[in-house]
From Swiss-Prot:
This is NADH-quinone oxidoreductase subunit L. It comes from Buchnera aphidicola subsp. Schizaphis graminum (strain Sg). NDH-1 shuttles electrons from NADH, via FMN and iron-sulfur (Fe-S) centers, to quinones in the respiratory chain. Couples the redox reaction to proton translocation (for every two electrons transferred, four hydrogen ions are translocated across the cytoplasmic membrane), and thus conserves the redox energy in a proton gradient. Its main location: membrane. The chain crosses the membrane at residues 1-21, 32-52, 79-99, 113-133, 136-156, 168-188, 247-267, 279-299, 327-347, 372-392, 410-430, 457-477, 491-511, 536-556, 594-614. Pfam families: Proton_antipo_M, Proton_antipo_N. It is a multi-pass membrane protein. It catalyses: a quinone + NADH + 5 H(+)(in) = a quinol + NAD(+) + 4 H(+)(out). Belongs to the complex I subunit 5 family. GO terms for cellular component: plasma membrane. InterPro entries: NADHpl_OxRdtase_5_subgr, ND/Mrp_TM, NU5C-like, Proton_antipo_N. The keyword Membrane applies.
Length: 615
């Protein structure tokens, strides 16, 4: 029985129901529609997972209908379910379901309750379409709807001007990137004569690596096309501003799912990048630079959600680094592990913010560990997984596989930078935890948490530990090329990595808990203040973009806003009016002026006549 299409259909039906009847049903009925639609899709996904337990090489396909048929161009609306799309689906629907359950507590009695669940259901449907589509064109449909959902949810509180500006910024940045994605699709069709992933993969086997200049251009455009959505340098600045939306949105879209769509697309088209090693190296360079920049920016942020946003950029950078060294499986495993612990951190921060009267500054948040131990443990486990705390966290194994793959592939310089940034990650993560939970501050009253609040956190907390990593077994064996695993030296690497994590936590404890006065005294130096301000403003990327792009664009737009053909009649009318005013000044009733004018006129007349005779 082929029912893949139902995975997309149920969330889509949920979106349509909630959109059409919003405001007319209770919050309880909204919950039932919004959650059950995703739950049914997740059950169907588990049905297919059972088919992959013993047959991981199996591929399910389903043709829905013929979309375009013009001469030799035949494009079907078809779905494909292999190990990669199944892994992504389990993550999207599993985490999406938990976030929807949490949102019933978070959004309770808030304006736009049904609208929120309608948007998130549409997002789940479009993200499912993105990973299930078997061709570029059908995938692009889901890709664009995901961007629309992101825009709608960032600007969910649209009555605030700043929120709409941030939503528009995210939309524009991702649109810039999408232009290159469209170009790459045209180049792919020109090269292969098809948009189908499996057909392109088959035809790529007959191409020569040495004779692929057009493939370099193609994969470069494809890389540029995914950088915007995955918030990689230089199209990364929108993500930190996207945190103005509801916190469950940040967990669902801007940490767990949408921002990883670029990683998925590169993994899906890995057979193209294998033919272009230079572009692969460029992917790893972009990843490591993004890791470096975002890690330093996170060190000085005071907004809890912006800290998590910069950490998201950094972790996606690690995924790009893995893709660049052909560690495809390591990238996807870290993608899913990161989605779990980052969703845990975002939901915990959302609970904390809501309980503390929407306070987001970590230095103003209260000492809450004794009042809500679940939040403290959630932050501790999620943060430990983020910093790759040894042995007991899932992040230790997933990120460790990436860095070890970089090392064994011979990129020692990239490995050192990645290891150093892992050290920075442990500092800024535990800076956040120590400041929030271990410093005395103003106390806030916490509301009693319901099952809808606690259950998602407990499930995510469990899967963020080592048990989650060992339970999750992704069916990727037949999706990517088989690579011989070399474990020589891995134990030594794990010791070094563990030491770095402990060192970062130790430094964070001494700077912000044990002896904070030394740190604040250090900040009084002028050069340190300038560096702090530079990093706090995200390396001034937005400032440079305004100077280089926005201001020239506004200047040119202002010039072009005037219709050029309107200039001539306006100028002619102004000339007539000016001439008329000058002539009128001569009619002033002064006889001497009239005689002088006549005298000058007669003399000019005779001079002209004389000149005509002489010529």
């Amino acid at each position: 029985m082929n029912i893949i299409f139902l995975i997309i259909l149920f969330p889509l039906i949920g979106f349509l129901f909630l959109s059409l009847i919003q405001g007319t049903i209770s919050e309880r009925n909204t919950n039932i529609i919004g959650i059950s639609s995703i739950f049914v899709s997740l059950i169907i996904t588990f049905f297919y997972i059972t088919g992959f337990i013993n047959y991981s090489s199996q591929i399910f396909t389903q043709k829905l209908f013929s979309w375009i048929s013009i001469n030799e161009l035949d494009i079907d609306c078809s779905l494909i379910l292999d190990g990669l799309s199944l892994s992504m689906l389990a993550m999207i629907l599993g985490i999406g379901l938990l976030i929807h359950i949490f949102s019933t507590w978070y959004m309770k009695d808030k304006e736009g309750y049904s609208r929120f669940f309608a948007y998130t259901n549409l997002f789940i449907a479009s993200m499912s379409l993105l990973v299930l589509a078997d061709n570029f064109l059908f995938m692009y449909l889901g890709w664009e709807i995901v961007s629309i959902c992101s825009y709608l949810l960032i600007g969910f509180y649209y009555k605030t001007t700043n929120n709409t500006s941030c939503a528009l910024k995210a939309f524009v940045f991702t649109r810039i990137s999408d232009v290159f994605l469209i170009i790459s699709m045209f180049l792919i069709y020109n090269k292969y004569g098809t948009f189908n992933f499996q057909e392109i993969k088959f035809l790529s086997n007959f191409l020569n690596v040495e004779d692929c200049f057009d493939l370099n251009v193609l994969t470069l455009c494809l890389l540029l096309g995914v950088m915007g959505k995955s918030a990689q340098l230089p199209l990364h600045t929108w993500l930190s501003d996207a945190m103005v939306g509801p916190t469950p949105v940040s967990a669902l879209i801007h940490a767990a799912t949408m921002v990883t769509a670029g990683v998925y697309l590169i993994a899906r088209t890995h057979f193209l990048f294998l033919l272009t090693p230079k572009i692969l190296y460029l992917i790893s360079l972009i990843g490591i630079i993004t890791i470096f920049i975002s890690s330093f920016s996170a060190l000085v942020q005071q907004d809890i959600k912006r800290i998590l946003a910069y950490s998201t950029m950094s972790q996606i950078g690690y995924m790009f680094l893995a893709l660049g060294v052909k560690a495809w499986t390591a990238a996807i495993v870290h993608l899913i592990v990161h989605a779990i612990f980052k969703a845990l951190l975002f939901l915990s921060s959302g609970s904390l913010i809501l309980s503390c009267n929407n306070e987001k500054n970590i230095f103003n948040l209260s000492k809450v560990s004794s009042k809500c131990p679940l939040l403290y443990v959630s932050f501790l486990v999620g943060g430990a997984s983020l910093v790759s705390f040894p042995l007991i966290t899932s992040g230790f194994y997933s990120k460790g596989n990436i860095l070890f793959s970089v090392l064994k592939d011979g990129y020692f310089n990239l490995f050192l930078i990645g290891l150093f940034c892992s050290f920075l990650t442990s500092i800024y993560t535990f800076r956040m935890i120590f400041v929030i939970f271990h410093r005395s501050s103003v106390s806030f009253v916490f509301s009693n948490k319901r099952l809808a609040h606690n259950l998602p956190l407990l499930i995510l907390l469990f899967f963020s530990t080592m048990f989650g990593y060992f339970i999750i077994r992704l069916p990727l064996f037949y999706v990517f090329p088989m690579v011989k695993s070399l474990e020589n030296g891995k134990f030594l690497y794990e010791i070094i990595s563990s030491f770095i994590s402990f060192l970062g936590i130790f430094i964070a404890y001494h700077i912000w808990i044990k002896q904070p006065f030394w740190f604040f005294r250090f900040l009084k130096f002028k050069i340190i203040k300038l560096i702090h301000k530079f990093l706090l403003n995200g390396w001034y990327f937005d400032f440079f973009y305004k100077i280089l792009f926005i201001h020239p664009y506004l200047f040119i737009s202002k010039i072009l806003s005037y219709e050029p053909f309107d200039f001539f009649p306006t100028f002619f009318v102004a000339f007539i009016k000016k001439t008329n005013s000058i002539v009128l000044k001569s009619v002033n009733g002064n006889v001497k002026c009239y005689i002088s004018t006549m005298f000058v006129g007669i003399n000019l007349f005779f001079i002209l006549v004389l000149c005509s005779f002489l010529s």
